[in-house]
Swiss-Prot record:
Topology in membrane: Multi-pass membrane protein
Name of the protein in its database record: Fluoride-specific ion channel FluC 2
Residues binding Na(+): G71, T74
S-S pairs: none
Pfam families: CRCB (PF02537)
UniProt record, GO biological process: cellular detoxification of fluoride
Amino acid sequence: MISIILVMIGGGFGAIARSAITDYFNHKFTSKLPIATLIVNLVGSFLIGLTIGLSISISWFPAFFVTGFLGGLTTFSTLAKELTLMMTPKFDINLFLNYSLLQFIIGFIACYIGYHI
């Protein structure tokens, strides 16, 4: 039961952080590329790799930080929505492919780097 509460609390903080980051970048930058989602997913990928690589032995930490906070911070559903919305009558295949590659390949690389630090 305690792990469920830790996931809920961490997830709430992660979602608040994502919302703040999204608001900040949406007001600071105008771009065809959804930069805020890219940033939260890359930071989250790096941090999950770092967390796994450090093998933190605090019993409550994975539930609170990895599943909760990073689960709330990162967002696959928003990525899927953004990729779907790119498929308009003015569909730009290069933007679509570049954004997809940035999310998946650079996300993996960020996780890998975090793991091996």
